[in-house]
Amino acid sequence: MNFFKFTAIVTDHIPRALRQTFRLMWDRKFGPVLQHWDDSEAVRRSFAAMEGGTTTIPTHQSYEEWDCTALFQATIFAQSFALPDSTGHSKTLSGLYVKPLGLPRGRFHASVVSSGGDDYETVALAIDQLRLLRNSLFHPAKGEMSKPTFNQYLQLVKDAFKALGLKTDEIDGIGSEVGFPTSEVANLRRKIRNRNMAIYGLGVGVGLL
């Protein structure tokens, strides 16, 4: 059941966490000068315009429908939240804080809290950690996960949530469950199958999502 418990975290709880974080990021930066994120067509058009008018983020849809890939694109890969580097060039949060680390494939960030007290770096590292954890589920999924691996991943998720200022109560609840209803397992299997078909059918590298 460890695999399915982690799948539930990835498919249900991480997207919700990313939406909360995106909305908070937007409201902090654009709320006072533009408008707070109310998920209206108008605010989504404004976001699309800030991304250059052409974006892979489905801004024509409610952000409640955005999947993890879109939410990563809308946060750490978004031009809207880009910051200047030491030379004054604008870089996305991923480009500024994550890419320079050169993290090897299959590895996770040792810490998601900025050693220098940079809140933007903490947000970037925490979101990227969730991206790495999400990718691990589909790389490739065998339907099995050892208890030590599950415990490690669970702690990484909790650390990322805490760094983003999010509650971990529901994650703790999943960690303590002894099993899932058969119907829930079937639903999780379907989500994995559909996700794998989308990834490999399009020939998209998981590491790029």
List where the protein language model places each region:
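Feature for intrinsically disordered/low-complexity regulatory segments and propeptides
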Residues: 1-136, 140-191, 195
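Long, hydrophobic or amphipathic alpha-helical segments
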Residues: 188-209
